[in-house]
Amino acid sequence: MISALILKSMLSIADTSLFINILNLSSELRDICGFTTVPNASQFSRFKIKFEKDLKNFFDYLVEITDPICDEINSYLNDILIVDTTGIEAYVNENNPKKFDTLLRQCKALSKNNPTFNAHSFACSKMPKVSYANPDIKLSYMNGHYCYALKTSIVTNGLGIIRDIDFLNDKSTNITEAATASEAKDTYDSKSLIPTLNKFFSKHDFKYKYFLGDAGFDAVDNYKYLYKDKNIIPIIPLRRAPSSPMPGFNENGVPTCPNDNKLLMKFDGITREKGRSDRIKWICPKSKKTRINGKTQYILTCENPCTTSKCGKIYQVPIDNNIRMHTVIPRNSSKWNNLYKTRTIIERTNFMMKYPLALQYTKLNNTESLKSEVILSAITQLIVVLIANNMNNTQNILSIKKVIS
């Protein structure tokens, strides 16, 4: 049965009835699936409901055996951990985006006469918080619109290969308390990261150097968890820059020259000493670090130095002072920007799961069935990684059709 479900994903067939008809017409496909007779639709459905946890265990096993392959393909990208949240829209009556949009327009018309009236929160309060058919299907803001979906966190490496899937059931997030749709999503994202990664690291003893996440994960607790607890460098943009930066710093937490606040000091590495917290070392922007006779020296070219030191001003900033602003890799530096560009690979993975693997077109509203479909999509990707590795065709690991064609 599992072979048939993986084949169904590979062929981008969302409808089980259509897949059954194809199996009835093709003896070759029946042989691949190991069927002498084709199961009916209810047998497929019962399998997904009954064996959802077993499918997850199988997926976790595939994650373990594909990690060395990912490391062999590109060890640098395999040292990068990426997390994104998404939602699998269920086949429920409430999933009509026009309904919320119409309600929001009506509320915005009311707010014209009352500037303190929050149209977004009021519109959300009038919508059912969960689907009548299944309370696990909740009102969410996903993929640019409101819908009723099974919320999911996807974890990948820098290659876009799925490392974990987590179905969070966070009851502490109230979508009606958010002032905007994006704020509602960011609030959910910020609270989902630590539980998701705790589950992931409890199953896999993997080590990562960098974490990439969008601005939704910009929360102090997330920085502390990643850097202090997991020894992972977080690469996360600010959700919103401080309205008034700290004196002597710009909006990204970079110290400025005392004589010219438009002149940013230069990053010069991390200072680590036993018994002291890690510190970011910044040097004068007009000081050049060089090697002379085997020794490191600084050459200062400033005409109006702010210090008598021959190397110019040096500023050591403890990371613990403000772990969100004082990032190990300076925010918006060339290294930070190059790393963050890699984050878009998870968007490709989400797209692949929903469209080439037909997850977006499933007509399901049962929790276990929806979870099984998501897990099967991830299993299919990892099976393709194994096939591509055996075929020495790893450059196409994110293109299922190219690998199996």
Q: Each PLM stretch: what is its role?
A:
Residues 16-33:
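DNA-recognition alpha helix
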Residues 283-328:
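Long, low-complexity, polar/charged, intrinsically disordered or flexibly structured peripheral segments
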Residues 46, 50-211, 215-228, 239:
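Polybasic low-complexity intrinsically disordered regions
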Residues 32-52:
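Major-groove recognition helix of helix-turn-helix-like DNA-binding domains
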Residues 180-183, 187-293, 330:
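An internal, acidic/charged active-site-proximal segment
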Residues 23-24, 215, 248-281, 319-365:
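Short amphipathic alpha-helical "interface-anchor" segments enriched in bulky aromatics
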Residues 1-11:
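Basic, short loop/linker segments at the boundary and entry of helix-turn-helix/winged-helix-like folds
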